[in-house]
């Protein structure tokens, strides 16, 4: 949401999110998440894909998050081909606003996560290959104050 100068609130849409639900009635359900946006705006020079060498691709979003989505797909193929695959349900969410704070997808994420046995996000590892257990975040806040305008030095009552 965004607060206008007059105090009214606008909803900010950040694109369409992809949700796939498989076996929603299963007793064991998982949530797998990722994102499709990148940190680079459309007019940034880093907008093309380049093969650096066979098997090594460079471009916006290749590691964060397309590499993670490829790992997610491999994990889902493993689930589907396992003997228990038919008993496991899952939702896959690929949101379109992760790099800008997930403002429009946060309620969707919370709703999909409810009641799941596990939720897995497929962000890339740290540069040395170790698991990223946490990352810094960001927040944007707006406050609406109502009342009568006054200044103690001019109107002490």
Which positions does each model-derived feature cover?
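Acidic/histidine-rich catalytic neighborhood of metal-dependent amide-processing enzymes
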Residues: 65-136, 140
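Glycine/serine-rich anion-binding loops at beta->alpha junctions
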Residues: 56-70, 151
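Residues forming anionic-ligand binding surfaces in small-molecule and nucleic-acid pockets
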Residues: 61, 140-146
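Acidic-enriched catalytic cores of C-N bond-cleaving enzymes acting on peptides and small amides
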Residues: 152-157
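Acidic/His- and Gly-rich active-site-bordering loop/insert found
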Residues: 1-60
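Solvent-exposed residues in well-ordered beta-strands and their adjoining turns
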Residues: 21-23, 123, 144-148
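Conserved hydrophobic/aromatic beta-strand scaffold that supports enzyme active sites
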Residues: 17-21, 119, 142
């Amino acid at each position: 949401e965004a607060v206008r100068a007059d105090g009214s609130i606008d909803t900010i849409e950040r694109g369409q999110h992809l949700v796939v639900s498989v076996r929603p009635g299963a007793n064991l359900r998982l949530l797998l998440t990722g994102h499709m946006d990148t940190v680079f705006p459309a007019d940034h020079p880093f907008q093309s894909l380049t093969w650096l060498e066979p098997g090594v691709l460079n471009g916006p979003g290749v590691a964060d998050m397309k590499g993670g989505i490829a790992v997610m797909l491999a994990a889902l193929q493993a689930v589907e081909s396992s003997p228990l695959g038919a008993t496991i349900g899952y939702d896959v969410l690929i949101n379109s606003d992760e790099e800008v704070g997930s403002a429009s997808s946060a309620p969707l994420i919370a709703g999909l996560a409810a009641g799941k046995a596990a939720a897995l996000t497929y962000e890339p590892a740290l540069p040395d290959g170790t698991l990223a257990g946490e990352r810094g975040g960001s927040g944007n806040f707006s406050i609406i104050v109502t009342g009568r305008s006054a200044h103690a030095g001019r109107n002490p009552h």
